[in-house]
Amino acid sequence: MLTKQQDAYGRIVWDHLHGRPLREIVERDDGWFDTSSAAPRYFAEFRHWPPHQRAVMKYVCGRVLDVGCGAGRCCLYLQKRGQPVVGIDASPLAIQTCRERGVKDARVLPFTRIHRGLGQFDTILMMGNNFGLFGGRARARWLLRRLRALTSPNARIVAESNAVYQTKNPDHLRYHRFNRRRGRMSGQLRIRVRYHRYCTPWFDYLMVSPDEMKAIVAGTGWRVQRFLKSSGSTYVAIIEKDGRKRGG
């Protein structure tokens, strides 16, 4: 669990909830950093979501595990639809924010610590580029196998990522080469988030092309069924369990 000083992301969403202006800093391990006011989109209502995110929600069925639930926007939308949903996040303050906003079942739990005690799910939801929480190729394949044990026979994973090779930014292209030289995937970011005096530990966040995603998923008991594109480099994958019945 993140300590109070490490929970920079949680402090960002908590402060936004309470009307405090903010700027977050994302720092990468090659020295690159960026600042943004991203918090409003963590709170956006469904009608303000990007079109591709709205479109994929028709694939979100049954009992849902929202991985990296943040401020709870997906949980709240699914609750309004009448679906049971459990939101998990490594950030204690993000979970506190979810609860204050009305999320019924929000738990402080890192993705790597998911367990059978959570119950069985029909959809694993990973929006907001949260395929990135798989971290890297090996950990992704390990977690995908774990997810098989937590999901129903006709389960799906609905996961958003960013096709990193579409960039023309020389800093990002240089980072891709830097990663490949040290045996990492091009889009395997090593980052941390800063906000005022708060700073997360360094963590891996994985962005992949559609072909890379297919290769990661292959042989784990899941398969990519389709991709839904956005107007930019982000996209959503519908990943189905091997042996899933059509129409289920």
Language-model features: locations:
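Conserved SAM-binding strand-loop segment of SAM-dependent methyltransferases
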Residues: 102-113
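A short glycine-rich, Lys/Arg-flanked "PGG" loop and its adjoining helix->strand segment in the class I
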Residues: 140-153
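Class I SAM-dependent methyltransferase "Motif I" SAM/SAH-binding loop
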Residues: 68-72
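SAM-dependent methyltransferase
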Residues: 11-15, 152-214, 218
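N-terminal auxiliary segments of SAM/dcSAM-dependent transferases
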Residues: 1-27
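Conserved alpha-helix/loop element of class I SAM-dependent methyltransferases that forms part
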Residues: 43-63
